[in-house]
Amino acid sequence: MGAVMGTFSSLQTKQRRPSKDIAWWYYQYQRDKIEDELEMTMVCHRPEGLEQLEAQTNFTKRELQVLYRGFKNECPSGVVNEDTFKQIYAQFFPHGDASTYAHYLFNAFDTTQTGSVKFEDFVTALSILLRGTVHEKLRWTFNLYDINKDGYINKEEMMDIVKAIYDMMGKYTYPVLKEDTPRQHVDVFFQKMDKNKDGIVTLDEFLESCQEDDNIMRSLQLFQNVM
């Protein structure tokens, strides 16, 4: 399921990219695992409003059936809590510490802040990460970086996310990172985004900065085709 939109352009890694690539892996894995079965049987238990989810997301009804069966296989209760989410996520980054980034990512999936992610939450985010427009992906990324959900990103929030990404990558980075590398990257990007120099980045500033600066867009990896 999962740095959403990657890490900065100077960071190269032997690991897979976080949010979008893991989301893509999950979708492919579950589709391959279940598709043959779906050819012969109907999904007997569906969340309410499957047709509504089809209208609200960029998935077909068949794709939603595949995703739902896979979600139920991984989470029989129909919801996933943060501890389980962290355990699943950590499997993709065995050489680093993914717990902090998984915490932030879980909060971005848990849009209602209930402490659990339902299938509806999961598939809505997955739709954005895999098939959303650039604008939708940027808004989702802004929400990830807005840790305290006050509608703004301050430098420390950005630093917390970036540091969590580097921690998650662990030793599998090239070139080897210096301890102050995350801070240097945050300083550069925050200066570009905070256009009125008031110490915070608004959604409008974030959207404008990302769309007018090719370096920022590349660093967020919004143009990577995953479908």
From Swiss-Prot:
Single GO biological process annotation from the record: regulation of potassium ion transmembrane transport
Q: Which PROSITE patterns match?
A: EF_HAND_1 (PS00018), EF_HAND_2 (PS50222)
Q: Write out the residues that bind Ca(2+) 2.
A: 194, 196, 198, 205
Start and end of every EF-hand domain?
Answer: 38-94, 97-132, 133-168, 181-216
- Record-listed Ca(2+) 1 binding positions: 146, 148, 150, 152, 157
Name any one GO molecular function. Answer: potassium channel regulator activity
The protein's topology relative to the membrane is: Peripheral membrane protein
Q: In which tissues is it expressed?
A: Isoform 1 and isoform 2 are expressed in brain and kidney. Isoform 1 is also expressed in liver, pancreas, skeletal muscle, small intestine and testis. Isoform 2 is also expressed in lung, pancreas, leukocytes, prostate and thymus.
List locations, semicolon-separated. Cell membrane; Cytoplasm; Cell projection, Dendrite
Name a GO CC annotation attached to this entry.
synapse
Q: Which InterPro entries match?
A: EF-hand-dom_pair, EF_Hand_1_Ca_BS, EF_hand_dom, Recoverin
UniProt main location, coarse: membrane
Q: Which keywords does UniProt give here?
A: Calcium, Cell membrane, Cell projection, Cytoplasm, Ion channel, Ion transport, Membrane, Metal-binding, Potassium, Potassium channel, Potassium transport, Repeat, Transport, Voltage-gated channel
Q: Which domain of life is it from?
A: Eukaryota
Which residue ranges are recorded for the region named Interaction with KCND2?
Answer: 214-227
Q: How does it assemble?
A: Component of heteromultimeric potassium channels. Identified in potassium channel complexes containing KCND1, KCND2, KCND3, KCNIP1, KCNIP2, KCNIP3, KCNIP4, DPP6 and DPP10. Part of a heterooctamer composed of the tetrameric channel and four KCNIP1 chains. Probably part of a complex consisting of KCNIP1, KCNIP2 isoform 3 and KCND2. Self-associates to form homodimers and homotetramers. Interacts with KCNIP2 isoform 3 in a calcium-dependent manner. Interacts with Naja atra venom CTX3.
Quote the function comment for this protein: Regulatory subunit of Kv4/D (Shal)-type voltage-gated rapidly inactivating A-type potassium channels. Regulates channel density, inactivation kinetics and rate of recovery from inactivation in a calcium-dependent and isoform-specific manner. In vitro, modulates KCND1/Kv4.1 and KCND2/Kv4.2 currents. Increases the presence of KCND2 at the cell surface.
Concerning its family, UniProt says: Belongs to the recoverin family.
The protein depicted here goes by the name: A-type potassium channel modulatory protein KCNIP1
Q: Which organism is it from?
A: Homo sapiens
Taxonomic placement: Eukaryota, Metazoa, Chordata, Craniata, Vertebrata
